Amino acid sequence: MSKIDLTINKEGLLHNIQTAKENNIIIPTIAQMQNPDLIPEKIKEKLTHTGLWDVDPVNLFRISWHNEAKETGGLYQKTPNYVEIPSSVSGVPCRILAMSGKWFPTGCHKVGASFGCLAPRLVTGQFDATYHHAVWPSTGNYCRGGAFNSKLLACDSVAILPQDMSKERFDWLKTIAGQIIATPGCESNVKEIFDKTWELKQDPSMMIFNQFAEMGNPLWHYNVTGYALSDLFENVKKPGQRLAGACFTSGSAGTMSAGDLLKERYPGMKLAVGEALQCPTILDNGFGGHRIEGIGDKHIPWVHNVKNTDMVIDIDDEDSQRLLRLFNCKEGQEYLKTLGLSDEQIEKFTWMGISGIANVLCCIKFAKFYELTEDDVVVTVLTDSAVMYKSRVEELNEMYGAYSAQAAELDHNLHMLNLKTDSMLELTYPERKRVHNLKYYTWVEQQGMSVEDLNAQWYDTKNTWDAVHAQAKELDELINAFNDEVGLLKAL
């Protein structure tokens, strides 16, 4: 696995600089995403009268976990937005902190991962905004983020996603993406997406940004999501509390690199990866369709640092579906009040989308496995919110009938409090290597990666994962040079 290629293409770079001038585009640095205090005051002033989802280049500066929880006019805050799951809900004594992606543009943190993939090629000129189309293969949210960033950066985009994804995804994409391609199947049908990208690759104007293989994805999550989770923990921890673990379900596995950063800062913690029980690829070399939208794609992503992963946790998709209804129906919210939750806490539970709920369930199983106490904290992220799944709640109501307080109590007990430590595995060295070796069949046999790079991921951490994570500084230098050539910062 080589580092991100930052070779300059002078012709493409000149075209991109001119495009940026014409469209008033200033590109934020990774450092500014980590610490919004570094953002110029004139840009912040413009944000005070810009909506969170507005198609305005200034919203590139809202690719941050530190946004205020406002639909319009929001600036930044020291502590990232998060949902804490009380013990009365989780059934475990430890603290579970889930950092919210709802307050990114598009309502999902994938706008960050897609930036991490596009920005290096844009500021080097490898991607020419006047010639190339940005192709975003995805199981839903990544192509939304990629299409949004493409629009802000004045690039043409092609979104590819499975036809069975939620209606809300397609409705929104129709307003943003230049072209939408729906591939056969559901969440776990990524092979069909890859096949479509190979077809599109025959056209030299189509540039593929494959989140499962692009090292810009883990670079962004390590340097932005990882730092934000550390900020969150440090800002809300109580005396004597320790960070015991982080749990992330794997779609592209980009967020697992946030865990790499956390393990460096908190050496005693453990990092767990989650997947759907109906598609147990990591746990059991398994396969199958499932309903946890955004994760679990019947392969091991190229960008997953498996060697640094301590545990795999499988979540039944029925649990996340039932809890989505509990948290988003009036009857379920009334039930949550009986557990002592405030109106503010209940509102925050709507910040959890389906994969976010699965992440929280991973944290609960993790806590039960390690018998965590009040002194322990487990962190995760909420990729998106329930906004993307209102149609799914309606489908559940049609499937199971009208909701009630009794059904809510039953769902809570069966699908959260009743979680066991089954279908999970603390990974030994040989077991991690077994998972890592699965990459061969997708990436070497099918997608053109080399055995040498595959082995380097396992045996040479310093020149692979560590080297990619460290490229943020070099990328920022290129972004600053690009902005200087565009000249808009000086004119602020």
Spell out what each predicted region is:
Residues 1-492:
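PLP-dependent amino-acid enzyme catalytic core
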